[in-house]
Amino acid sequence: MKAVGLFGRKYVNVERREYDLGEIGPNDALVEVKASGVCGTDLNFLRDSDDCFHPLGHELSGEVLEIGSCVRNVKPGDKVVIEDVAACGCCRDCQEGNISLCRSLIDGEGRPGMATHYKVNAHCLVPFDGISFEAASLTEPLAVGITATQESDIPFGGSVVVFGHGPIGLFVARCAKLRGAGFVAVVGMGTGTPFGDKRFGAARALGADLTIEGRKVGVADEVRKVLPNGADRVIVTAPPVVVPDAVNCCRFGGRVSVLGLSFGGHEVVPLNVNQIVFNKIDVKGVIAEPAMHFRQAIDLLKSKAVDPDVFITDYVTFDTFEQRMRDVLEQKIPAIKVCLRPNPTE
């Protein structure tokens, strides 16, 4: 079967390609994609990556059309979200219970999730009901927020500073509150602009106690006005350039969790290692691979403990995608999460 999907590179150079999905194997499923969210990684590819065209999209939901002969967990007609990278269940780490360390990962084999159809090992499919396909497309980034806050080991009633007010930063801030953080600050940029005000407003709606404009003030100084000893946990969802500021915000014996990425040389930053050593700061890298916590994320979206309407601000089709990505990167529209409908019904 043929599918049509999106591939992109710098600067917002998007190609719509037709490609062959191949035969449906005994463990595979064919999904008609109904909604696919635009991730910060996709935006990074479109802004910074000049090495090749990258398959776009990994935050997707859809309907099962066909299954292989050995598939038992889903059936045609089921609504599903897709774990973009799933644990194999067979390697030593998986069998010893260290699923998060699996390196024999099951994925989409280089196919874009921003596509009409998606073929994948059915092991990656998680059924859902009770929410729209668009809301369900938030499952993957919300699961990243759950992973980040779990890996950060936030103390009950503790203080958290989140760098970044994009979708992942906002999910992290909300999850930190749900995990019992007593104080959450969100650091971003763009105060006084529609783009920044939209995101800071969302942060406050999701429970943030303080929002900080990172370009206009010393972030650590602002944090220490409220938390003289620094924050218990600092979580970086913004580009790596802010990691030194994140360390400055952290208390003695605290933890800095880093999941923000960048490309094109922007991933290399200077860091005062002595400050980390003498202050006994734990710096931890976090990546939500393999995907975990999808069922928890679905439950949070269904209950509206995490409200999908706060996040999805814009909808696009294949025809409007490229221009809208330019608008987002140039902050011409106050977007938080853009959702692609590759098979629009209207």
Residue ranges and their predicted role:
Residues 1-3, 171, 217-221, 229, ...:
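C-terminal hydrophobic helical "lid"/dimerization subdomain
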Residues 20-36, 46-92, 124, 129-131:
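Glycine-rich beta-strand-centered segment in the early N-terminal region that forms part
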Residues 79, 159, 254-255, 282:
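Short glycine-centered segments of the SAM/dcSAM-binding site in methyltransferase folds
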Residues 88-163:
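NAD(P)H dinucleotide-binding glycine-rich loop of Rossmann-like/cofactor-binding domains
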Residues 131-216, 221:
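Mid-domain Rossmann-like dinucleotide-binding core that forms the NAD(H)/NADP(H) cofactor-binding site
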Residues 152, 197, 201-281, 345-346:
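Glycine-rich cofactor phosphate-binding loops and adjacent beta1-alpha1 units
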Residues 189-192, 262, 289:
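Residues in the short beta-alpha loop(s) of Rossmann-like NAD(P)-binding domains
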